Regions:
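N-terminal intrinsically disordered, low-complexity tails enriched in polar/charged
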Residues: 1-6, 278-282
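Generic structural signal of hydrophobic/aromatic residues within well-ordered alpha-helices
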Residues: 19, 42-46, 99, 177-178, ...
Protein backbone atom coordinates (compact mmCIF):
# COMPACT_ATOMS: atom_id res chain seq x y z
CA UNK A 1 0.00 0.00 0.00
CA UNK A 2 1.26 3.47 -0.86
CA UNK A 3 2.46 5.80 1.87
CA UNK A 4 0.69 8.75 0.25
CA UNK A 5 -2.62 9.72 -1.28
CA UNK A 6 -2.47 12.32 -4.05
CA UNK A 7 -5.75 14.07 -4.82
CA UNK A 8 -5.10 15.93 -8.05
CA UNK A 9 -6.75 18.13 -10.66
CA UNK A 10 -5.61 19.53 -14.01
CA UNK A 11 -6.51 22.80 -15.66
CA UNK A 12 -6.25 22.92 -19.43
CA UNK A 13 -6.97 25.13 -22.39
CA UNK A 14 -7.27 24.45 -26.12
CA UNK A 15 -4.01 23.60 -27.86
CA UNK A 16 -4.06 26.19 -30.65
CA UNK A 17 -1.26 24.48 -32.59
CA UNK A 18 -3.18 21.20 -32.63
CA UNK A 19 -6.34 23.02 -33.69
CA UNK A 20 -4.51 24.54 -36.65
CA UNK A 21 -4.00 21.05 -38.06
CA UNK A 22 -7.69 20.15 -38.02
CA UNK A 23 -9.91 23.25 -38.18
CA UNK A 24 -11.47 24.32 -41.49
CA UNK A 25 -9.45 26.90 -43.37
CA UNK A 26 -12.18 29.54 -43.11
CA UNK A 27 -12.14 29.36 -39.31
CA UNK A 28 -8.37 29.71 -39.22
CA UNK A 29 -8.58 32.72 -41.54
CA UNK A 30 -11.13 34.42 -39.29
CA UNK A 31 -8.61 34.21 -36.42
CA UNK A 32 -5.76 35.58 -38.56
CA UNK A 33 -4.89 39.28 -38.75
CA UNK A 34 -3.88 41.20 -41.88
CA UNK A 35 -0.21 40.44 -41.22
CA UNK A 36 -0.87 36.71 -41.21
CA UNK A 37 -0.50 36.33 -37.44
CA UNK A 38 -2.91 33.91 -35.80
CA UNK A 39 -4.72 35.03 -32.65
CA UNK A 40 -4.56 31.83 -30.57
CA UNK A 41 -7.22 32.99 -28.12
CA UNK A 42 -9.63 33.83 -30.94
CA UNK A 43 -8.85 30.51 -32.63
CA UNK A 44 -9.55 28.63 -29.39
CA UNK A 45 -12.86 30.41 -28.88
CA UNK A 46 -13.89 29.70 -32.46
CA UNK A 47 -13.04 26.02 -32.01
CA UNK A 48 -15.13 25.86 -28.83
CA UNK A 49 -18.06 27.51 -30.58
CA UNK A 50 -17.76 25.09 -33.50
CA UNK A 51 -17.73 22.21 -31.01
CA UNK A 52 -20.86 23.62 -29.36
CA UNK A 53 -22.66 23.75 -32.73
CA UNK A 54 -21.70 20.16 -33.53
CA UNK A 55 -22.21 18.51 -30.15
CA UNK A 56 -24.15 20.89 -27.93
CA UNK A 57 -21.15 21.40 -25.65
CA UNK A 58 -18.17 23.72 -26.02
CA UNK A 59 -15.75 21.32 -24.32
CA UNK A 60 -13.23 20.07 -26.87
CA UNK A 61 -12.22 16.40 -27.26
CA UNK A 62 -9.42 15.31 -24.96
CA UNK A 63 -6.67 15.38 -27.60
CA UNK A 64 -7.10 19.14 -28.16
CA UNK A 65 -6.23 20.12 -24.59
CA UNK A 66 -2.91 21.27 -23.16
CA UNK A 67 -2.00 21.50 -19.48
CA UNK A 68 -1.55 24.86 -17.81
CA UNK A 69 -1.75 23.74 -14.18
CA UNK A 70 -1.72 20.59 -12.03
CA UNK A 71 -2.52 20.97 -8.33
CA UNK A 72 -2.69 18.31 -5.65
CA UNK A 73 -3.58 17.63 -2.05
CA UNK A 74 -1.09 15.29 -0.44
CA UNK A 75 -2.39 13.11 2.40
CA UNK A 76 -0.93 10.20 4.31
CA UNK A 77 -2.04 6.65 3.52
CA UNK A 78 -4.94 6.97 5.97
CA UNK A 79 -6.22 10.17 4.36
CA UNK A 80 -4.85 12.67 6.89
CA UNK A 81 -4.20 16.02 5.19
CA UNK A 82 -0.54 17.01 4.75
CA UNK A 83 -0.55 19.90 2.27
CA UNK A 84 -2.01 21.38 -0.90
CA UNK A 85 0.21 22.78 -3.63
CA UNK A 86 0.73 23.18 -7.36
CA UNK A 87 3.21 21.17 -9.44
CA UNK A 88 6.08 23.44 -10.47
CA UNK A 89 7.23 23.86 -14.04
CA UNK A 90 8.09 26.61 -16.49
CA UNK A 91 5.96 25.05 -19.24
CA UNK A 92 3.62 22.14 -19.95
CA UNK A 93 6.48 19.73 -20.64
CA UNK A 94 8.09 20.37 -17.26
CA UNK A 95 4.81 20.35 -15.31
CA UNK A 96 3.81 16.95 -16.69
CA UNK A 97 7.34 15.56 -16.27
CA UNK A 98 7.41 16.61 -12.62
CA UNK A 99 4.00 15.06 -11.97
CA UNK A 100 5.01 11.77 -13.61
CA UNK A 101 8.29 11.79 -11.69
CA UNK A 102 6.32 12.14 -8.46
CA UNK A 103 4.27 9.07 -9.38
CA UNK A 104 7.42 7.18 -10.36
CA UNK A 105 9.33 8.05 -7.17
CA UNK A 106 6.54 7.86 -4.56
CA UNK A 107 3.85 5.61 -6.06
CA UNK A 108 0.98 7.53 -4.45
CA UNK A 109 -2.61 6.41 -4.50
CA UNK A 110 -4.27 8.73 -7.04
CA UNK A 111 -7.67 10.25 -6.32
CA UNK A 112 -9.51 12.43 -8.82
CA UNK A 113 -12.94 13.50 -10.03
CA UNK A 114 -13.42 12.31 -13.60
CA UNK A 115 -9.69 11.62 -13.73
CA UNK A 116 -10.32 8.37 -15.57
CA UNK A 117 -12.62 10.12 -18.03
CA UNK A 118 -10.39 13.10 -18.72
CA UNK A 119 -7.32 14.05 -16.66
CA UNK A 120 -5.32 10.84 -16.87
CA UNK A 121 -5.86 10.01 -20.56
CA UNK A 122 -5.23 13.65 -21.41
CA UNK A 123 -2.00 13.68 -19.38
CA UNK A 124 -0.73 10.51 -21.05
CA UNK A 125 -1.50 11.88 -24.52
CA UNK A 126 0.41 15.06 -23.68
CA UNK A 127 3.24 12.99 -22.16
CA UNK A 128 3.61 11.18 -25.49
CA UNK A 129 3.95 14.55 -27.21
CA UNK A 130 7.13 15.14 -25.17
CA UNK A 131 8.34 11.50 -25.25
CA UNK A 132 7.99 11.21 -21.47
CA UNK A 133 7.87 7.87 -19.66
CA UNK A 134 5.46 6.58 -16.99
CA UNK A 135 6.41 2.92 -16.40
CA UNK A 136 5.04 2.74 -12.86
CA UNK A 137 1.67 4.08 -13.95
CA UNK A 138 1.45 1.40 -16.66
CA UNK A 139 2.79 -1.46 -14.53
CA UNK A 140 0.33 -4.37 -14.66
CA UNK A 141 2.33 -7.03 -12.81
CA UNK A 142 -0.81 -7.40 -10.68
CA UNK A 143 -3.53 -7.76 -13.29
CA UNK A 144 -6.41 -6.80 -11.01
CA UNK A 145 -4.75 -4.19 -8.81
CA UNK A 146 -2.91 -1.38 -10.59
CA UNK A 147 -3.28 2.28 -11.54
CA UNK A 148 -5.47 1.53 -14.55
CA UNK A 149 -7.86 -0.97 -12.96
CA UNK A 150 -11.29 0.62 -12.94
CA UNK A 151 -13.03 -1.42 -10.25
CA UNK A 152 -10.26 -1.53 -7.67
CA UNK A 153 -9.39 1.66 -5.80
CA UNK A 154 -6.13 0.51 -4.23
CA UNK A 155 -3.96 2.62 -6.54
CA UNK A 156 -6.40 4.96 -8.26
CA UNK A 157 -9.91 6.13 -7.43
CA UNK A 158 -12.06 8.21 -9.73
CA UNK A 159 -14.68 9.57 -7.34
CA UNK A 160 -17.08 10.28 -10.19
CA UNK A 161 -16.99 6.59 -11.11
CA UNK A 162 -17.58 5.41 -7.56
CA UNK A 163 -20.19 7.96 -6.47
CA UNK A 164 -22.19 7.54 -9.70
CA UNK A 165 -22.03 3.73 -9.38
CA UNK A 166 -19.75 3.64 -12.41
CA UNK A 167 -21.77 6.12 -14.48
CA UNK A 168 -25.16 4.53 -13.71
CA UNK A 169 -26.37 8.10 -13.17
CA UNK A 170 -25.30 11.31 -14.85
CA UNK A 171 -25.30 15.00 -13.98
CA UNK A 172 -22.96 14.73 -11.00
CA UNK A 173 -20.96 17.91 -11.51
CA UNK A 174 -18.23 18.43 -8.92
CA UNK A 175 -19.39 21.99 -8.25
CA UNK A 176 -23.03 21.21 -7.52
CA UNK A 177 -22.26 17.97 -5.68
CA UNK A 178 -19.80 19.69 -3.34
CA UNK A 179 -22.10 22.67 -2.75
CA UNK A 180 -24.97 20.32 -1.92
CA UNK A 181 -22.77 18.52 0.60
CA UNK A 182 -21.79 21.72 2.41
CA UNK A 183 -18.44 22.44 0.74
CA UNK A 184 -17.51 25.66 -1.05
CA UNK A 185 -17.73 24.21 -4.56
CA UNK A 186 -16.68 26.57 -7.35
CA UNK A 187 -17.26 29.81 -5.48
CA UNK A 188 -15.22 32.22 -7.62
CA UNK A 189 -13.82 30.90 -10.90
CA UNK A 190 -15.27 28.20 -13.17
CA UNK A 191 -13.43 25.93 -15.59
CA UNK A 192 -14.65 27.72 -18.69
CA UNK A 193 -12.90 30.89 -17.46
CA UNK A 194 -9.41 29.36 -17.50
CA UNK A 195 -8.87 30.31 -21.14
CA UNK A 196 -9.68 33.97 -20.43
CA UNK A 197 -7.45 33.99 -17.35
CA UNK A 198 -4.55 32.43 -19.27
CA UNK A 199 -4.62 35.00 -22.07
CA UNK A 200 -5.10 37.78 -19.51
CA UNK A 201 -1.79 36.59 -17.99
CA UNK A 202 -3.30 35.64 -14.62
CA UNK A 203 -1.57 32.34 -13.77
CA UNK A 204 -2.00 32.91 -10.04
CA UNK A 205 -5.78 32.96 -10.44
CA UNK A 206 -5.65 29.68 -12.36
CA UNK A 207 -3.48 28.20 -9.62
CA UNK A 208 -5.95 29.30 -6.93
CA UNK A 209 -8.83 27.79 -8.86
CA UNK A 210 -7.00 24.51 -9.45
CA UNK A 211 -5.99 24.21 -5.79
CA UNK A 212 -9.54 24.97 -4.66
CA UNK A 213 -10.81 22.17 -6.92
CA UNK A 214 -8.39 19.72 -5.32
CA UNK A 215 -9.53 20.81 -1.85
CA UNK A 216 -13.15 20.20 -2.84
CA UNK A 217 -12.19 16.80 -4.27
CA UNK A 218 -10.21 15.89 -1.15
CA UNK A 219 -13.12 16.78 1.14
CA UNK A 220 -15.46 14.76 -1.09
CA UNK A 221 -13.02 11.85 -0.81
CA UNK A 222 -13.15 12.09 3.00
CA UNK A 223 -16.95 12.02 2.96
CA UNK A 224 -17.00 9.04 0.63
CA UNK A 225 -14.47 7.11 2.71
CA UNK A 226 -16.56 7.89 5.80
CA UNK A 227 -19.71 6.70 4.00
CA UNK A 228 -18.26 3.35 3.01
CA UNK A 229 -16.69 2.65 6.39
CA UNK A 230 -13.07 3.15 5.38
CA UNK A 231 -12.72 6.10 7.76
CA UNK A 232 -14.08 6.82 11.24
CA UNK A 233 -15.48 10.07 12.60
CA UNK A 234 -12.34 10.92 14.55
CA UNK A 235 -10.19 10.62 11.45
CA UNK A 236 -12.72 12.57 9.37
CA UNK A 237 -12.84 15.53 11.74
CA UNK A 238 -9.09 15.55 12.39
CA UNK A 239 -8.41 15.53 8.63
CA UNK A 240 -10.70 18.54 8.15
CA UNK A 241 -9.03 20.36 11.03
CA UNK A 242 -5.59 19.63 9.55
CA UNK A 243 -6.72 21.03 6.18
CA UNK A 244 -8.12 24.18 7.79
CA UNK A 245 -4.99 24.74 9.88
CA UNK A 246 -2.67 24.27 6.90
CA UNK A 247 -4.42 26.64 4.51
CA UNK A 248 -4.94 29.24 7.26
CA UNK A 249 -1.20 29.18 8.04
CA UNK A 250 0.31 28.56 4.60
CA UNK A 251 -2.27 29.79 2.08
CA UNK A 252 -3.66 32.84 3.86
CA UNK A 253 -3.42 35.00 0.73
CA UNK A 254 -5.44 32.58 -1.40
CA UNK A 255 -9.04 33.55 -2.12
CA UNK A 256 -10.22 30.03 -1.28
CA UNK A 257 -8.87 30.01 2.29
CA UNK A 258 -11.69 31.94 3.96
CA UNK A 259 -14.55 30.00 2.28
CA UNK A 260 -12.97 26.64 3.11
CA UNK A 261 -12.14 27.51 6.70
CA UNK A 262 -15.68 28.80 7.24
CA UNK A 263 -17.25 25.70 5.70
CA UNK A 264 -15.03 23.41 7.77
CA UNK A 265 -15.91 25.30 10.95
CA UNK A 266 -19.62 24.96 10.12
CA UNK A 267 -19.25 21.26 9.29
CA UNK A 268 -17.59 20.52 12.62
CA UNK A 269 -20.16 22.59 14.52
CA UNK A 270 -23.20 21.16 12.73
CA UNK A 271 -22.07 17.58 13.22
CA UNK A 272 -20.57 17.95 16.69
CA UNK A 273 -23.10 15.38 17.96
CA UNK A 274 -21.21 12.75 15.99
CA UNK A 275 -18.30 13.19 18.35
CA UNK A 276 -20.26 10.95 20.71
CA UNK A 277 -19.62 8.22 18.17
CA UNK A 278 -15.88 8.56 18.75
CA UNK A 279 -16.16 6.61 21.98
CA UNK A 280 -17.66 3.64 20.15
CA UNK A 281 -14.86 3.72 17.60
CA UNK A 282 -12.13 3.27 20.20
Amino acid sequence: MSEYICVFDCETLPDAKALLRTLPEDLVKSATDKNGKIDEKALSLLACEEQRKNSGQAFLPVLFHKVVCISAVLADKNGKFIKVNTIEGKDEHEIIANFLNFIENHAPRLVSYNGRGFDLPMLMIRAMKYNLRAPRYYNTSDKWCNYRTRYDATWAMDLLDYISDFRAVSGLRLDTLCAMLGMPGKYDVHGDQVLELFYANKPQKIKEYCESDTLNTYWLFLKYELLRGKMGYEQYFSSLEAMSEFIASNKAAMSYTKPFCECIEKEIKDFSYLKNELKTEK
